[in-house]
Amino acid sequence: MQMFCYQCSQTANGTGCTEYGVCGKSPTVARLQDNLVFAIKGISAYYYHARELGYDDPEIAGFLDEALYSTLTNVNFDAQSFVEYALEAGRMNLKAMQLLKKAHIETYGEPTPVEVETGTKKGKGIIVTGHNLKALEELLKQVEGTNVYVYTHSEMLPAHGYPGLRKYKNLIGNLGKAWYDQRKLFAEYPVAILGTSNCVLIPSESYRDRMFTTSIARLPGVKHIDGYDYTEVIEKAKSLPDLEEKPGSYKLRTGFSTSVVVSLADKIKELVEAGKIKHFLVVGGCDVPFKRNEYYREFVQKLPKETVVITLACGKFRINDLDLGDIDGIPRLIDVGQCNDTIVAIEIAQALAKVFGVEVTELPLTLVLTWMEQKAVAILWTLLALGLKNIYVGPVLPAWVNEDILKVLTAEFGLKTISEPEKDIKEILKV
């Protein structure tokens, strides 16, 4: 199948055009339109959360209108223009991430490094999953002074880095890892669960009656809460058995904001010039439950000790329990936050480039990313729009990428797919 499109009444056999569009659009144009729609979805997620906190940017809204319109039937048949739209989507996603970062920092303060517990405290519990910091804060306000303790899950882990959230004593720790462990995790702990955004899964019967959604998230058979009154969630938590006092086997570090890392720039420069730091790598992204994604842990474990790893998004859970130590006080593993905090990794790279007096593309920096869904598509186009090279992507190529699109991505943007950890490390470090 070269393409699939069934958005108009002319569609082949009334079921879908699969070789060429009845309208005349080529398979490559159809796939680039799909790519653009996926990027728009990713931008919309970050833009939505910024607007929840009262922050807006009409330029982003205007682009979303125009870009979506361009995919309408009989509007645009030009493949090159859709590549340009994708790059513009990358630039708009950069603005959306900047807007959301500003919203988070002005609302909750700039993150600072913190160690997060991974065990449980004696008392009642609520697990919060998703990405929505506002929903978390409103819940924390409502459980203050009670024995109902709140645990983050997956992409909510970075919440612990924000001073305005960390101040709440009922924010206890983090349970579980990436989004896909939730069915097992939520069934294991007798707690109420609040799903706040994307990355929720249809629940099993074992915990459906104690799960709630809020904001954009919806699940069949699960109570949805409009607004931020979480009384029902709290009462459900109170009705359940206590969690045991059980310390975790390790702690997780997060909260490395742009300012924190940039404050170390001169020290980092000294270490690079002394040969103690030889390469920086961004390893992270959206994780998937494929055996293939064991690659990322093995990759980091096999890196030489003169490397520093910046991680983010739920892909961090492949590696954030590893003790990589430090290089003269500079941590070798730096967690900068959620997937939208890709902006932090970008700002760190730009700051280091300035310190060294070079372009970002001239830094000893490689990106090794895992992708799962549409937000990752928007982020990839952001990186490409910034002119970044040395990007490795896995676990698989996007299904909508055909040979023509792949040629553009590899020839013009230098995109590579992951192979084997040792082979890629040798290629990256040129050893």
Curated annotation (Swiss-Prot):
Annotated compartments: Cytoplasm
Residue sites binding [4Fe-4S] cluster per the record: 5, 8, 17, 23
Domain of life, per lineage: Bacteria
GO annotation, cellular component aspect: cytoplasm
Residues the record lists as Cysteine persulfide modifications: 286
Disulfide bonds: none
SUPFAM superfamilies: Prismane protein-like
EC annotation from Swiss-Prot or TrEMBL: 1.7.99.1
Keyword Ribonucleoprotein set for record: no
Bound cofactor: record note: Binds 1 [4Fe-4S] cluster. Binds 1 hybrid [4Fe-2O-2S] cluster.
Cofactor(s) required for function per UniProt: [4Fe-4S] cluster; hybrid [4Fe-2O-2S] cluster
UniProt keyword Iron, yes or no: yes
Catalytic activity as recorded in UniProt: A + NH4(+) + H2O = hydroxylamine + AH2 + H(+)
This protein's UniProt keywords: 4Fe-4S, Cytoplasm, Iron, Iron-sulfur, Metal-binding, Oxidoreductase
Amino-acid positions noted as binding hybrid [4Fe-2O-2S] cluster in the UniProt annotation, renumbered to this chain: 131, 155, 199, 286, 314, 339, 373, 375
GO molecular function annotation: 4 iron, 4 sulfur cluster binding; hydroxylamine reductase activity; metal ion binding; peroxidase activity
Biological process, per Gene Ontology: nitric oxide catabolic process; response to hydrogen peroxide
HAMAP family on file: Hydroxylam_reduct
PANTHER family: HYDROXYLAMINE REDUCTASE
Protein family: Belongs to the HCP family.
Role played: Catalyzes the reduction of hydroxylamine to form NH(3) and H(2)O.
Protein name in the entry: Hydroxylamine reductase
Originating species: Thermotoga maritima (strain ATCC 43589 / DSM 3109 / JCM 10099 / NBRC 100826 / MSB8)
The gene coding this protein: hcp
